[in-house]
Structures are given as structure tokens and as C-alpha cells.
Design a protein with these regions (language model features):
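Transmembrane beta-strand segments that form the barrel wall of outer-membrane beta-barrel proteins
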Residues: 27-39, 71, 111-123, 145-155
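Residues on the lipid-exposed face of transmembrane beta-strands in outer-membrane beta-barrel proteins
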Residues: 31-35, 48-56, 70, 99-105, ...
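Predominantly the C-terminal beta-signal and adjacent terminal strand-loop region
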Residues: 24, 74-78, 128-172
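Cleavable N-terminal export/targeting peptides
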Residues: 1-24
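Flexible, solvent-exposed loop segments that connect beta-strands
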Residues: 33-43, 71-95, 121-129
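Short glycine/proline- and aromatic-enriched beta-strand/turn motifs that initiate or cap beta-hairpins
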Residues: 19-65, 161-171
Length: 172
């Protein structure tokens, strides 16, 4: 009888503990526009991108997860004087595929900030990959969408490709 009472007590206790658990894992996808800064501004001035995130809530205030997407920057055209004529050369577009881990901190229900850290693969022939970082700030528009602002950087040997991004992200 004593074993049955203890068993029943632990079953009720485990039920209560599991009833308190809330699964905070979710997927986010969105798009952004960007403008380049620093060395990158010599080669491109505007970019667009796709962002994909998988969040896992580790507490009410913190999330960890994985991030990827595509960052596409439009190459600048340059004009070269060849004798009496000018020749316009089309600048090469630059494309990165970031593979990163991230963290997010939620000081309020509608604002979060954090950062992505990982490696960005260069997808075109003349672009190498490098260390990727992206601090972010996000403001919820609704329970399923948010405005997302970030500063993104890819460190390639002695140069850093940097940009400021702004976009919309949707929660699924």
C-alpha cells in the first residue's frame, strides 16, 4: 500500500511539473534591405536578403538557435577612361550564405536584441567566406511579425564586409 501511495504521489508531482512546461520553439523567416559601409561600399551600395531562424527558448528571457539565409549585394558599375572614350564596367555582385548560431534576449515582450555568430560562405567565384557576426534589434509589430534591424559583418582576411540592414520577419 505504501508503494502505491508513493507511486501515486510521484505521478501527480511529475504531471504538475510537466503541466508548467511551455514549448517556446518556433521558426522565423523574413527579408531585408541593406546598405554597405566601409570597404564594402567601394564594391556595392545596396543589398537584399532572406533570413531564416530556428528558435529554442531556454527561459522566458533568452532564446538560442540557428540562423541562415542569403545576403545579395548589387555590384557597382565603374567607368574607365580609355583614350577619348569612356568604358563602363559592370561590377560583380557579391553573395553570402551565413551559417550561424544566435542568442536573443527579451527585456520586454515586444523588444528583443542579440547576435548571430558563425561563418558566411562566399557564393560567387571571387568572394571568399569568412567569420560572420550580426548584432540585431527587433520590435514586434504583432505576435507573428516584427521589424528587424542589424549591423552585419563578414571578416575576410584583412578586410571586413559590413552593412546595415532593416527588414520584416514573420513567425511560424
Amino acid at each position: 500500500m505504501r508503494k502505491h501511495i508513493l507511486f501515486s504521489f510521484f505521478m501527480l508531482l511529475s504531471y504538475q511539473i510537466m503541466a508548467q512546461y511551455v514549448d517556446r520553439s518556433f521558426f522565423k523567416a523574413g527579408f531585408h534591405a541593406s546598405t554597405t559601409l566601409g570597404d564594402a561600399a567601394d564594391f556595392a551600395n545596396l543589398g537584399i536578403g532572406l533570413d531564416l531562424y530556428q528558435h529554442w527558448g531556454i527561459s522566458k528571457k533568452f532564446d538560442l538557435g540557428l540562423a541562415t539565409g542569403v545576403q545579395y549585394y548589387f555590384g557597382l558599375d565603374s567607368t574607365i577612361d580609355v583614350g577619348p572614350t569612356a568604358v563602363t564596367v559592370r561590377g560583380e555582385d557579391t553573395v553570402f550564405l551565413p551559417l550561424a548560431g544566435f542568442f536573443r534576449f527579451y527585456p520586454t515582450k515586444s523588444i528583443n536584441f542579440g547576435g548571430d555568430i558563425g561563418y558566411a560562405l562566399g557564393l560567387n567565384e571571387s568572394t571568399d567566406g569568412g567569420f560572420y557576426y550580426r548584432p540585431t534589434l527587433s520590435f514586434d509589430l504583432s505576435p507573428s511579425s516584427a521589424l528587424n534591424f542589424s549591423y552585419a559583418g563578414v571578416v575576410i582576411e584583412d578586410n571586413t564586409w559590413t552593412s546595415i540592414t532593416g527588414g520584416v520577419i514573420f513567425r511560424f
